[in-house]
C-alpha cells in the first residue's frame, strides 16, 4: 500500500514538474515571439504601473516618506540603475520615477484641490485653500450653523467646527463663556476661535459674524443691493458701511450655551485625532508695517481673563487661560534686540481687536524655564530649595538658578531691565498691576489645587449683587476711527465670604468700578482704590480667620538692576504654620508676563501633586537631567535654536536612531487640547513646527524625547510655506530668514533674503491703502488674511470694474440670466481687449521662482506637519474618488464618445466572430457577436472554456498516436494560454477605460457648473462699470476660480490622452486575439496532422545529451557540465528542404514552431532550469529527496533585485535598532547584544548589502550604507562604536572589509531558545533557509538498506557501474570536458588549468578506492553521507543568497562517521571556494567540543551567546500568550519573576496552558498571580503522580508551620517572593504502600527567593526547623518528647547550613562576597550582564594549599612525558538537568556528598549534569561497554560545575522532590556530629587504573603522584568534626527550638485559623496569608 502511494505521489510530482517546465517555456515564448510585441509592451507598461503603485505605500508611512525626500537616496538609486548592464531597465526606471511620478503628484494635487473646494454645490461656489484654514464663508443670518457646516463635504479634512442643532444660532456668550464654549473645552479634539468682525454696535450686543457661512441661493444674485448690504457680505465701494445685525434672543442663547457645553460632541480634526490645532486672534493692519521706530525694542503683551460665575472650582481657570490665548495677540519674544517689530502707536494696537500691553525684557524668555521649575520645586518640596525656617532672600530665583546650573560670567549678568508702557490712560499701570495680581493669585491657586484653592478664591471680593461682574479697559485712540475694545472678566462670588464681608462694614473693595469719561459709554475702567492701602491688612485678617498655612512672600531684589525686578515667590510647607508676609505692594507686578502666564504649566499635570518628580511623570526632572541634550528644551523662546541644533547636528543620527524624537501626550501648555496616545515609535522626527503663525492665530506643538504630545515650554521658530498659505507677520522677516537659514544648513544669500521678504511679507494691496483707516481695519478683520495670500480680491483682480453710474444698469442686466454662448463671447472679447493679464492673476505665479521656493520649503516638508499635510493632499482625495471611479460604464459615457466607441468595437468583434465561425463552435461565435458593454467578458470566458473542451477531446483522440503528439497538445495549450492572457489584458484595459471615462464625466460635470459660474462672473464684470462694484459674492471673484479652470483643463487633456492610449491598445488586443484564433485552426485539419507526424518521424526533435547528467555522479565534476550546449542542429538542411517540399505550409510552420520551442527550452535550461535538470536527471537523489527538492523548487529560483525592494530596504525603518524598547504591555524589554548583532547581520544580508561595492568618494552612499554596519560592528572597539577608516583616493572596496561575519556560532545552554532565534530570523529575512542536520550523519540507519556482508551488494555494485561508466566517458572526451567548463563556477581551477589530466592515474585511483569500499562497507556508508552533506552545500551555493543553519555543530568531530563531512564543510566553506552570499549560523550548547578548524578566521569567526530570558522578556512572552488566547493578565509587580525564575521559553508555554485551563474552569478571563501559582503547583507537583486529598493533619501542620515562619521572619525580605500556595493535595504514592509512611511532603518550590545579603543563614535554619517544631507541638504528647529533626531529612539540610554558618563565623567575612563575572566569549563586553558563579573556597588554608597543589601539578607535568590528551578533553554524559539552581551545592563547595543521600531517596538530579568537563571516578570492576547506566550509578562525584542563576543578587532554593521525610526509622549516624564517610582507602581504588569515557588524560608515569594530590585535596576541603563544633551545634539547635516553640505557642490561634481555612478552601495563597497576619 505504501509503495503504491509513493508511486502515485511520484507520478503526480513528475507531472507537476513537467507542467512547471512547460509553463516556463510558454512564458519565455511569449517574451521572445515577434507577434507578441504589443503584448510584451503591455506587460512592460503594466510593470511600470506597478512600479508607480509601489510608491503609494510609502506615502502612508511617515518615516519612509520623509526618508524618501532625501535626495541622497535618489542619487543612490539612479547610480545603481546607471551601473546596470541593461540600458533599457535603467531608462524604464528613470522614466517611471520622473514622468509617472510627476504625473501622479500633479494629478493628486489637482484632484485634491477640486474635490475639497466643494465645487459641485447647488448653484454656488466655495473656495478652500490648500491648507484647511477656516475662511469667511458668506451666508444669510438666519441660516443655522449645522446646515452651513453640513454643506461642506470636506469637514473631515479641515479644522473641525462644532455646529449647533437645527434651529439654533450662534450667540455671543457661546464664545465668551469658557464653561459653555466648545472652543475652550479641553476634552474636545479641536478648538477654533471664530473670525470676528467689527461693528459699530455695542460689544455686548454683537454676535460673531461670518464664522461659518451657508451657500447663497441664486435668488440673492437677483435681489437688491440692500439685501446684500444687510448681510454684510459684499464690499461695494470705499463708502460702504457694515450694518448691524439683530441680537439673538436670550432664551435661544441659553440653548446654544447648553449645546456647546456638551462634552460628548467631537469632530475629527484635519491632522487626525493625534493632533489638535489652536487658532488664535488676528493680526495688526498695515499701520504696523509703516513706522516701526518708536517701539522697536518693545514687545506686545495682552491678556484677557474670562470666567463663568457659576463655577466654583478653580481648576477651571485652565479654561480661562485657554480663552485668553485664543483672544490675545502673542508676539514672539526674541533674544536679539531689534528683531521684533511692534505697532507704533495705540491706534495700531486697536486694530488687533485686543488689549495690548507693552513690556520689554529681551531675556525673560530664557529665564522662565528655570524660574518656573524652581517655583514648582519650592511649592512641592520647599525643604529641598530653602532651609527650614528661613525666609526668602532678596535675591531672585533666577539668580539662584544661575548660580546652581549656569556658569558664572554669563551674558545674563549684564541684564538690564527696561519697562516701557505707552498708554494714554493715566490709570493703565494700575490696571496692569491689578490684573497681574489677580492673574498670579489665580495661577497659584490653580497650581496648588485644593490646598490653596479654597484660600485664594476669597481674594476676589466684589459686589455680590453683580452676578456677572464685568470690567474692561478703555484705551484712548489716536487717529481716525473709533474701535471699541472690551473684554469680559467674570469672577464668581464666594459664598463662604458672606460673614466676613458683613463683619467688615467699612470694607473697601480692592477693585473700584468707575465709568470712563471716554467716548464709549459701555467701557469700564478699573483702578486701584484706597483698598490697596489696606490690602495687606485685609489679607492677613482673612487668612488668620481661615487659619491657613499659606505663606506668600513678595520680595524684591535691588542689586544689578536699575529698576526693581518684582518677583512672586510662594512656598507651601507640608508641616507647620506659616504667616503671610507682604512687604510691599508693587512686587505683585512680576518681571514679565511670560513668567506669570506660564507658571501654570509647571502644575498642569496631576503628577505634580506628588512630592517626588519621577522621570517618567515630571517634565521638571527631564529638563534638568537632560540639560545637555542637543535638543535642549530649557530654552523655550529661542525659536530657531531648536531647529538649528537639529539640523546642525549629525544627520546620520536620525537615520540610525529615528525614534529619538517623539511627542508629549500629556497636556502641558494652557491652550493645548488633548492627551493623545502616542507611542515612542509613531513618528520619526518629532514635531519641529511648534508655533505656526497664521497672522496671530497660533497653535502650539512641542518636541521632546518623552512620551507626551505637547509641552508648552518648548517653542521654536515657525517655518512658513507658500504652499500651505501660512502667512508670516510683517514684523517677523528677520527671524524667519534666520530660522530658514538654520534649517537649510547653508546660509541664504542676500538675493534670497530679499526674495524671501518680498514673498512672505508683501505690503497690503492697493485697495487696502486707498480705503480709510476704519474701513481698512474692518476689511482686515473681516477677511482676517493679508492680500498677499491671494485670498483678498483687489482692484487688480477686477480690472473690468465699471464706474458707479453704470450700477443700476448692471443690476438690471443681472436679473436676466445670460446664456452660456453669450457669456463665452463676452469673456473672449474681454480677453482680447485686455491683452495680457496681470501677473498676480495667474494661479501658478509661484512657479516662476520654483527653485528658490523648493529650497526654502524643503525643510518644512521633512517635518511631521508637512508630512501630514502632504499625506492629506495626495492620499485623502483617492478615498473620495474611489466610489466615483468604480461606477458603471453606462452612467459615465457621454453620448458621442460611447456611440463612436461602441460602433468601432462592434465592427471589430463582428469581423473576429466571422473569421472564427469556421473553426470554433457556434456557441463561441454567437457569444462573440453579442453586445460589447454587457457580455464581452462572458464571451471570452466561454470561448476559452470551449477551447479547453476541444483540447480535452483532441487529447483523447490523439492519445494512441504516440508521444510525439504531446508536443502538439502543448502547442495548442500554449495558444489557448495566449488567448486567455489576451482576454485578461483586454478585460483589464476595458475596465480601466471605463474608469477613465467615468472620471471624464465627473470632471465635465464640475467644469460645466464651474464654467457657467465663471462666465457669469466675467460677463457680469464686463457689464458693470469700472467704479461700480457688481452685486456678486466675494467668493466668486477670487482668482482661485481661474486656477480651478486651468486644473480642469489639464485633467481633461490628461483624460483624453489616457482614453486614446487605451483605445489603441484595445484595438491591437482584438487583432492579436484574431491571430491567435487563426493559429488554432490547423490543429483541426486531419491532413496537417498526418504530414506533421511524418515529418516528426523522419526528423525528430533533438533530445538532451544524457552524457551531461551521468557526470553528475562525480562529486567534483557535477557543476562543470551544466552550461554545456547540447542542442544538436540538423546537419543537412538542403536534404531537409528537398524532402519537405511536398508538405503543406501549415505543417512546415507547425514543425518550425515545435523546433523553435525545443531549442528555447534547452537553451534556457542553462539559465534558470539547470537546477531542475540537475535534480530530475541526477541519480544521487533517492525518491524521498527528489520530491522534497521538487517541493522546495520555489526557493531555488533566484530573482534580480528591482527598484521596489531596493527602495523599500532603503526607506524601511528597522525597529530592531533600539536596544531598549517598550512592548505593548508596558514592560521594558532589554534585548541581548548578541541577538541584536545577529538580527542586523541577517537584515543586511536580506537587503543585498552584504557584498555591495561602491566608491568611497560618494558621500551619500557611504553614509547610508555604512549606517547599517555602524550599528552591528559597534562592539569591535573598546568604546562601543566602530570607527571606519576608508581607503584613500576613492578606490572601490567591499563592505566585507568592515568585517560583517559570514559565519556565526550561537552558543547557549539547553532551553535558552537558540533554535527559536535562528528560525525567527530566517523567517523574517525572506531568504532561503537550509538546515544541515548533523544528527542525520550520525544515524546508523541510512536512507538506503544495507545487506549482510556475505550477500551481494546491489547498491554498491550499482555505484561501481556508474563509476566505470564515468571512467570510460572521461577517456573519450578529455578535450571536450576542459573546453566546456564555465569559468564562473567555483571549481578546482588548478586541475583544469594544467590541461594534462592523467586519466590513467585517475582510473587506477578509482579502482583502488572501489576495492577498499568493497572490503569496508562502513566506509561506503560514511562516504554516502558525506556526499549528501555536500549536495546540501552545493544547493546552498546555487540558491544563494541564503542562510545555512547547522544545529549541534559540536557533533561533527565526535565520531569517526562525521570526520569526512566535517572536512567537506571546512573545504567548501573556506575563503577560496565558498560563495559570498551564504550566511552560516551554527549552534551548540557545548562550545568546548566544537572543532577548532570550524571557528577559524574565515569560517565561524563570530561567537554569540544566548542567555536565558530576563524577567521582562518572560513577562512579554507570557503576556503575548495570554492576549492571543483572549485572556488578560493581571500580575503583581514582582511576583511573576519569583514564580517563573529559571523557566525557559519551552516551560512557559505549558505553564500558561495550565493557567488558562484553571481560568476557564473558574469562568474568568483575567489571569492573576494566584492562578499562575496554582498552575505552577499543578505542573510541578502533579508531574509524577496523581494528587490525592490528604486527611493527615500532621503533614498540614508541618506545612503551616513553615509558612508561618516564612511570613513572620522573611516577609520583609521576600516581599512578593513568597512560597508556593499551601495545598492539602499530596502524592498518591505516599499512602499507597504504607511501608514508607508519611515519606513525602508537599514540595517546597519557592522556599527562600531572596538575597543572602538581606537574610542571614540563621533565618534559613529557622525555616528548615519550623515544620518539625510545629508538627511536634500540635501532635506529640508532652513537651518533653519534642525532638528536633527526628528521622527527617531536614537534619541533613540543617546540618549543612550550620556548617556554612560556622565557616562564615570563623572567617568573619561576608558569605559570598563579590561574585565573579562571566567572561563571555563573544565581543560584547560592554553589554554583558553580571552572572554570578560558584564562590571559591573560603578557607585561607584551603586556598593556599590549592595554589601549592597547582604548582606541584605543573611541576609534575613538566617532568613527565607521554601525555595522551589534555585534561580539558574530559567529557561526561548528561543524565538530567535541573530547572532551578540549588544554592547549597554552591555554598558547600568542596564538601563530600555521602552515598547515603541516594539511599535515603535524595535525588541527586543536579549532579551528573554538572560533571561536564570534570573527572569521573569509578570502580575497577565496572565496565563501560556492558551497562552505561550501572556505570553512571557506581561512581561518586567529587566536584560540581558552575551553576549560574538568572537574577542578580538573588537565588532560589529548590529542594527537589520529596525533600522532608516523616518516617519513624532512625537516621543512620549522629545528628550532631559529622563523620567522615570517605576514608583514604576508598579513594585509592582508582590508584591502579583511572578510566574516563573516551581517552585517558593522565600519563602512565604520573598517575601515582597526581592521585595523591587529589586525595590530599579532598582531605583539605573536609571540615573538621571535633567536640567544640558538636557543642556549638547543640547550642544552636536548642536555641532554635526554644525560639520556634515560643513563636508557635504565641500564635497558636493563627495556626488553627490557617488550618481551618486550608481545609475549607484547599488552597491558601500568599496574599491570604498576609491577611491572617494583619
Curated annotation (Swiss-Prot):
Residues 219-246 are annotated as: Disordered. It comes from the Eukaryota. It is found in: Plastid, Chloroplast stroma. Its main location: plastid. Keywords: ATP-binding, Chloroplast, Nucleotide-binding, Plastid. Pfam families: AAA (PF00004), Ycf2 (PF05695). InterPro entries: AAA+_ATPase, ATPase_AAA_core, P-loop_NTPase, Uncharacterised_Ycf2, Ycf2_N. One of its GO terms (cellular component) is chloroplast stroma. CDD domains: RecA-like_Ycf2 (cd19505). The keyword Oxidoreductase does not apply. Transmembrane segments: none annotated. ATP binds at residues 1308-1315. GO terms for molecular function: ATP binding; ATP hydrolysis activity. Belongs to the Ycf2 family. PANTHER family: PROTEIN YCF2, PROTEIN YCF2-RELATED. HAMAP family: Ycf2. Probable ATPase of unknown function. Its presence in a non-photosynthetic plant (Epifagus virginiana) and experiments in tobacco indicate that it has an essential function which is probably not related to photosynthesis. This is Protein Ycf2. It comes from Jasminum nudiflorum.
Amino acid at each position: 500500500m505504501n509503495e503504491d502511494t509513493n508511486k502515485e505521489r511520484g507520478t503526480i510530482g513528475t507531472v507537476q514538474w513537467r507542467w512547471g517546465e512547460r509553463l516556463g517555456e510558454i512564458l519565455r515564448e511569449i517574451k521572445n515571439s515577434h507577434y507578441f510585441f504589443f503584448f510584451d509592451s503591455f506587460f512592460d507598461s503594466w510593470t511600470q504601473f506597478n512600479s508607480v503603485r509601489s510608491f503609494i505605500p510609502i506615502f502612508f508611512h511617515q518615516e519612509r516618506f520623509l526618508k524618501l525626500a532625501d535626495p541622497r537616496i535618489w542619487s543612490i538609486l539612479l547610480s545603481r540603475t546607471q551601473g546596470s548592464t541593461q540600458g533599457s531597465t535603467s531608462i524604464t526606471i528613470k522614466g517611471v520615477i520622473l514622468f509617472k511620478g510627476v504625473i501622479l503628484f500633479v494629478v493628486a494635487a489637482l484632484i485634491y484641490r477640486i474635490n475639497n473646494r466643494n465645487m459641485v454645490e447647488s448653484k454656488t461656489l466655495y473656495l478652500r485653500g490648500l491648507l484647511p484654514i477656516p475662511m469667511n464663508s458668506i451666508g444669510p443670518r438666519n441660516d443655522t450653523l449645522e446646515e452651513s457646516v453640513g454643506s461642506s463635504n470636506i469637514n473631515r479634512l479641515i479644522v473641525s467646527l462644532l455646529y449647533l442643532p437645527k434651529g439654533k444660532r450662534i450667540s455671543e456668550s457661546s464664545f465668551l463663556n469658557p464653561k459653555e464654549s466648545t472652543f475652550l473645552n479641553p476634552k474636545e479634539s479641536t478648538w477654533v476661535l471664530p473670525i470676528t468682525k467689527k461693528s459699530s454696535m455695542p460689544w455686548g450686543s454683537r454676535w460673531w459674524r461670518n464664522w461659518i457661512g451657508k451657500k447663497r441661493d441664486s435668488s440673492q444674485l437677483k435681489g437688491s443691493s440692500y439685501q446684500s448690504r444687510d448681510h454684510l457680505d459684499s464690499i461695494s465701494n470705499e463708502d460702504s458701511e457694515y450694518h448691524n445685525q439683530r441680537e439673538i434672543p436670550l432664551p435661544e442663547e441659553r440653548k446654544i450655551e447648553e449645546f456647546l457645553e456638551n462634552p460628548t460632541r467631537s469632530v475629527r480634526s484635519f491632522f487626525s485625532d493625534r493632533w489638535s490645532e489652536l487658532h488664535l486672534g488676528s493680526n495688526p493692519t498695515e499701520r504696523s508695517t509703516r513706522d516701526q521706530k518708536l517701539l522697536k525694542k518693545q514687545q506686545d503683551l495682552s491678556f484677557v481673563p474670562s470666567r463663568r460665575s457659576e463655577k466654583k472650582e478653580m481648576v477651571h481657570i485652565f479654561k480661562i487661560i485657554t480663552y485668553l490665548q485664543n483672544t490675545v495677540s502673542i508676539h514672539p519674544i526674541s533674544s536679539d534686540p531689534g528683531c521684533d517689530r511692534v505697532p507704533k502707536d495705540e491706534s495700531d494696537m486697536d486694530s488687533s481687536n485686543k488689549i495690548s500691553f507693552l513690556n520689554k525684557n529681551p531675556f525673560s524668555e530664557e529665564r522662565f524655564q528655570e524660574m518656573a521649575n524652581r517655583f514648582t520645586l519650592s511649592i512641592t518640596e520647599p525643604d529641598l530649595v530653602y532651609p527650614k525656617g528661613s525666609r526668602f532672600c532678596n535675591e531672585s530665583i533666577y539668580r539662584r538658578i544661575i548660580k546652581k546650573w549656569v556658569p558664572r560670567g554669563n551674558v545674563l549678568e549684564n541684564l538690564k531691565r527696561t519697562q516701557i508702557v505707552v498708554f494714554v490712560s493715566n490709570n493703565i499701570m494700575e490696571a496692569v498691576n491689578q490684573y497681574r495680581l489677580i492673574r498670579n493669585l489665580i495661577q497659584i491657586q490653580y497650581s496648588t489645587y485644593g490646598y490653596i484653592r479654597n484660600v485664594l478664591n476669597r481674594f476676589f471680593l466684589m459686589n455680590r449683587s453683580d452676578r456677572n461682574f464685568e470690567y474692561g479697559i478703555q484705551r484712548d485712540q489716536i487717529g481716525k476711527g473709533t474701535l471699541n475694545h472690551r473684554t469680559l472678566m467674570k469672577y464668581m462670588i464666594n459664598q463662604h465670604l458672606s460673614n466676613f464681608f458683613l463683619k467688615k462694614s467699612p470694607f473697601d473693595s480692592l477693585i473700584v468700578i468707575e465709568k470712563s469719561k471716554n467716548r464709549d459709554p459701555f467701557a469700564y475702567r478699573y483702578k486701584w482704590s484706597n483698598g490697596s492701602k489696606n490690602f495687606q491688612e485685609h489679607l492677613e485678617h482673612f487668612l488668620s480667620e481661615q487659619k491657613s498655612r499659606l505663606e506668600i512672600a513678595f520680595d524684591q531684589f535691588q542689586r544689578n538692576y536699575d529698576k526693581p525686578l518684582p518677583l512672586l515667590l510662594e512656598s507651601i510647607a507640608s508641616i507647620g504654620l506659616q504667616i503671610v508676609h507682604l512687604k510691599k505692594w508693587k512686587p505683585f507686578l512680576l518681571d514679565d508676563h511670560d513668567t506669570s502666564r506660564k507658571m501654570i504649566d509647571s502644575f498642569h499635570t496631576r503628577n505634580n501633586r506628588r512630592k517626588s518628580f519621577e522621570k517618567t511623570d515630571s517634565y521638571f526632572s527631564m529638563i534638568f537631567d537632560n540639560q545637555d541634550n542637543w535638543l535642549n528644551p530649557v530654552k523655550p523662546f529661542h525659536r530657531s535654536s531648536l531647529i538649528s541644533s537639529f539640523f546642525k547636528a549629525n544627520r546620520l543620527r536620525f537615520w540610525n536612531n529615528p525614534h529619538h524624537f517623539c511627542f508629549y501626550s500629556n497636556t502641558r501648555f494652557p491652550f493645548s487640547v488633548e492627551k493623545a496616545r502616542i507611542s515612542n515609535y509613531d513618528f520619526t522626527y518629532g514635531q519641529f513646527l511648534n508655533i505656526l503663525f497664521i497672522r496671530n492665530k497660533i497653535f502650539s506643538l512641542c518636541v521632546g524625547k518623552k512620551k507626551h504630545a505637547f509641552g508648552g515650554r518648548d517653542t521654536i521658530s515657525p517655518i512658513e510655506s507658500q504652499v500651505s498659505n501660512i502667512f508670516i507677520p510683517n514684523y517677523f522677516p528677520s527671524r524667519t530668514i534666520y530660522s530658514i537659514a538654520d534649517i537649510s544648513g547653508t546660509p541664504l544669500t542676500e538675493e534670497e533674503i530679499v526674495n524671501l521678504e518680498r514673498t512672505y511679507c508683501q505690503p497690503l494691496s492697493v485697495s487696502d491703502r486707498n480705503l480709510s483707516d476704519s474701513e481698512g481695519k474692518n476689511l482686515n478683520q473681516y477677511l482676517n488674511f493679508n492680500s498677499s495670500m491671494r485670498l483678498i480680491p483687489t482692484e487688480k483682480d477686477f480690472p473690468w470694474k465699471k464706474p458707479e453710474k453704470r450700477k443700476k444698469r448692471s443690476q438690471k442686466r443681472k436679473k436676466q440670466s445670460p446664456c452660456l454662448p453669450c457669456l463665452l463671447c463676452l469673456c473672449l472679447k474681454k480677453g482680447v481687449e485686455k491683452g495680457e493679464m496681470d501677473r498676480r492673476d495667474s494661479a501658478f505665479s509661484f512657479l516662476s521662482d520654483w527653485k528658490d521656493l523648493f529650497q526654502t520649503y524643503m525643510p518644512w516638508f521633512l517635518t511631521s506637519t508637512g508630512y501630514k499635510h502632504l499625506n492629506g493632499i495626495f492620499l485623502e482625495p483617492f478615498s473620495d474618488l474611489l466610489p466615483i471611479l468604480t461606477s458603471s460604464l453606462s452612467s459615465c459615457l457621454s453620448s458621442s464618445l460611447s456611440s463612436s466607441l461602441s460602433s468601432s468595437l462592434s465592427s471589430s468583434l463582428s469581423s473576429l466572430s466571422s473569421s472564427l465561425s469556421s473553426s470554433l463552435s457556434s456557441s463561441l461565435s454567437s457569444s462573440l457577436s453579442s453586445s460589447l458593454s454587457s457580455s464581452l467578458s462572458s464571451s471570452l470566458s466561454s470561448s476559452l472554456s470551449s477551447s479547453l473542451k476541444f483540447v480535452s477531446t483532441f487529447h483523447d483522440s490523439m492519445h494512441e498516436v504516440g508521444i510525439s503528439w504531446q508536443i502538439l497538445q502543448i502547442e495548442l495549450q500554449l495558444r489557448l494560454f495566449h488567448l486567455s492572457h489576451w482576454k485578461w489584458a483586454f478585460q483589464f484595459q476595458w475596465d480601466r477605460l471605463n474608469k477613465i471615462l467615468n472620471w471624464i464625466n465627473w470632471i465635465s460635470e464640475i467644469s460645466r457648473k464651474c464654467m457657467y459660474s465663471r462666465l457669469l462672473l466675467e460677463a457680469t464684470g464686463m457689464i458693470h462699470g469700472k467704479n461700480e462694484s457688481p452685486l456678486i459674492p466675494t467668493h466668486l471673484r477670487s482668482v482661485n476660480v481661474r486656477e480651478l479652470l486651468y486644473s480642469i483643463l489639464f485633467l481633461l487633456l490628461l483624460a483624453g490622452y489616457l482614453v486614446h492610449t487605451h483605445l489603441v491598445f484595445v484595438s491591437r488586443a482584438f487583432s492579436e486575439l484574431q491571430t491567435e484564433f487563426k493559429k488554432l485552426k490547423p490543429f483541426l485539419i486531419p491532413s496537417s496532422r498526418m504530414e506533421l507526424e511524418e515529418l516528426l518521424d523522419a526528423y525528430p526533435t533533438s533530445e538532451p545529451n544524457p552524457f551531461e547528467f551521468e557526470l553528475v555522479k562525480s562529486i567534483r565534476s557535477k557543476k562543470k557540465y551544466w552550461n554545456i550546449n547540447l542542442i544538436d542542429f540538423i546537419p543537412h538542411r538542403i536534404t531537409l528542404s528537398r524532402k519537405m517540399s511536398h508538405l503543406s505550409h501549415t505543417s512546415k510552420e507547425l514543425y518550425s514552431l515545435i523546433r523553435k520551442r525545443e531549442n528555447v527550452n534547452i537553451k534556457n535550461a542553462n539559465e534558470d532550469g539547470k537546477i531542475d535538470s540537475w535534480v530530475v536527471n541526477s541519480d544521487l537523489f533517492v525518491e524521498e529527496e527528489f520530491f522534497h527538492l521538487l517541493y522546495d523548487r520555489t526557493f531555488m529560483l533566484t530573482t534580480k533585485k528591482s527598484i521596489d525592494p531596493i527602495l523599500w530596504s532603503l526607506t524601511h525603518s528597522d525597529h530592531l535598532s533600539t536596544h531598549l524598547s517598550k512592548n505593548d504591555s508596558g514592560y521594558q524589554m532589554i534585548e541581548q547584544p548578541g541577538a541584536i548583532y545577529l538580527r542586523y547581520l541577517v537584515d543586511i544580508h536580506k537587503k543585498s548589502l552584504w557584498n555591495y561595492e561602491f566608491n568611497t568618494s560618494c558621500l551619500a552612499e557611504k553614509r547610508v550604507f555604512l549606517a547599517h554596519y555602524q550599528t552591528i560592528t559597534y562592539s569591535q572597539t573598546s568604546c562601543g562604536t566602530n570607527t571606519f577608516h576608508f581607503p584613500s583616493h576613492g578606490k572601490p572596496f567591499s563592505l566585507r572589509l568592515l568585517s560583517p561575519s559570514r559565519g556565526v556560532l550561537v552558543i547557549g545552554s539547553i532551553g535558552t531558545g537558540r533554535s527559536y532565534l535562528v528560525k525567527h530570523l530566517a523567517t523574517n529575512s525572506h531568504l532561503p533557509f537550509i538546515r544541515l542536520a548533523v544528527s542525520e550523519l550520525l544515524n546508523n540507519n541510512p536512507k538506503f538498506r544495507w545487506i549482510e556482508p556475505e550477500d551481494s551488494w546491489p547498491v554498491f555494485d550499482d555505484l561501481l557501474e556508474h563509476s566505470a561508466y564515468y571512467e570510460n566517458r572521461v577517456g573519450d572526451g578529455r578535450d571536450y570536458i576542459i573546453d566546456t567548463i564555465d569559468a564562473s563556477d567555483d571549481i578546482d581551477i588548478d586541475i583544469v588549468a594544467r590541461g594534462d589530466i592523467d586519466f590513467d592515474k585517475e582510473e587506477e585511483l578509482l579502482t583502488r578506492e572501489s576495492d577498499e569500499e568493497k572490503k569496508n562497507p562502513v566506509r561506503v556508508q560514511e562516504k554516502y553521507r558525506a556526499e549528501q552533506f555536500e549536495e546540501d552545500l552545493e544547493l546552498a551555493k546555487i540558491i544563494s543568497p541564503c542562510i545555512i543553519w547547522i544545529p549541534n555543530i559540536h557533533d561533527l568531530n565526535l565520531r569517526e562517521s562525521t570526520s569526512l563531512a566535517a572536512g567537506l564543510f571546512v573545504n567548501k566553506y573556506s575563503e577560496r571556494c565558498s560563495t559570498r552570499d551564504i550566511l552560516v549560523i551554527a549552534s551548540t550548547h557545548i562550545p568546548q567540543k566544537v572543532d577548532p578548524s570550524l571557528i577559524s578566521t574565515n569560517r565561524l569567526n563570530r561567537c554569540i551567546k544566548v542567555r536565558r530570558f530576563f524577567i521582562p522578556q518572560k513577562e512579554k512572552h507570557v503576556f503575548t500568550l495570554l492576549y492571543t488566547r483572549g485572556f488578560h493578565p493581571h500580575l503583581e509587580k514582582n511576583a511573576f519573576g519569583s514564580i517563573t525564575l529559571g523557566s525557559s521559553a519551552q516551560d512557559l508555554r505549558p505553564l500558561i496552558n495550565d493557567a488558562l485551563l484553571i481560568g476557564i474552569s473558574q469562568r474568568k478571563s483575567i489571569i492573576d498571580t494566584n492562578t499562575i501559582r496554582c498552575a505552577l503547583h499543578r505542573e510541578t507537583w502533579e508531574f509524577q503522580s496523581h494528587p490525592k486529598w490528604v486527611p493527615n493533619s500532621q503533614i498540614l501542620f508541618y506545612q503551616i508551620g513553615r509558612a508561618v515562619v516564612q511570613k513572620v521572619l522573611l516577609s520583609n525580605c521576600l516581599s512578593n517572593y513568597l512560597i508556593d500556595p499551601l495545598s492539602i493535595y499530596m502524592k498518591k504514592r505516599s499512602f499507597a504502600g504504607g511501608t514508607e509512611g508519611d515519606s513525602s511532603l508537599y514540595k517546597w518550590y519557592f522556599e527562600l527567593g531572596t538575597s543572602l545579603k538581606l537574610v542571614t543563614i540563621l533565618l534559613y535554619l529557622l525555616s528548615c526547623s519550623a515544620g518539625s517544631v510545629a508538627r511536634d507541638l500540635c501532635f506529640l504528647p508532652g513537651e518533653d518528647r519534642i525532638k528536633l529533626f527526628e528521622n527527617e531529612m531536614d537534619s541533613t539540610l540543617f546540618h549543612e547550613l550550620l556548617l556554612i554558618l560556622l565557616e562564615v563565623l570563623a572567617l568573619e567575612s561576608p558569605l559570598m562576597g563579590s561574585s565573579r563575572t562571566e567572561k563571555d566569549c563573544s565581543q560584547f563586553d560592554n553589554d554583558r550582564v553580571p552572572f554570578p558563579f560558584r564562590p571559591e573556597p573560603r578557607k585561607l588554608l584551603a586556598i593556599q594549599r590549592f595554589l601549592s597543589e597547582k604548582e606541584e601539578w605543573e611541576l609534575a607535568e613538566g617532568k613527565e612525558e607521554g601525555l595522551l590528551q589534555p585534561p580539558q578533553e574530559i567529557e561526561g554524559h548528561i543524565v538530567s538537568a535541573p530547572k532551578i539552581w540549588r544554592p547549597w551545592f554552591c555554598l558547600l563547595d568542596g564538601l563530600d556528598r555521602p552515598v547515603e543521600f541516594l539511599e535515603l531517596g535524595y535525588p541527586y538530579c543536579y549532579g551528573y549534569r554538572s560533571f561536564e568537563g570534570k573527572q569521573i571516578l569509578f570502580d575497577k570492576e565496572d565496565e563501560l561497554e556492558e551497562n552505561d547506566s550501572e556505570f553512571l550509578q557506581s561512581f561518586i562525584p567529587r566536584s560540581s560545575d558552575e551553576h549560574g542563576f538568572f537574577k542578580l543578587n538573588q537565588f532560589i532554593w529548590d529542594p527537589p522532590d520529596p525533600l522532608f521525610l516523616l518516617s519513624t526509622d532512625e537516621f543512620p549516624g549522629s545528628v550532631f556530629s559529622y563523620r567522615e564517610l570517605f576514608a583514604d582507602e576508598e579513594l585509592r581504588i582508582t590508584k591502579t587504573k583511572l578510566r574516563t569515557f573516551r581517552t585517558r588524560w593522565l600519563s602512565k608515569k604520573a598517575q601515582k603522584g597526581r592521585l595523591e594530590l587529589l586525595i590530599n585535596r579532598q582531605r583539605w576541603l573536609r571540615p573538621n568534626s571535633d567536640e567544640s563544633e558538636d557543642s556549638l551545634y547543640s547550642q544552636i539547635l536548642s536555641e532554635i527550638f526554644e525560639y520556634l516553640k515560643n513563636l508557635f505557642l504565641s500564635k497558636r490561634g493563627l495556626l488553627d485559623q490557617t488550618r481551618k481555612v486550608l481545609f475549607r478552601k484547599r488552597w491558601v495563597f500568599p496574599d491570604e496569608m498576609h491577611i491572617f497576619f494583619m
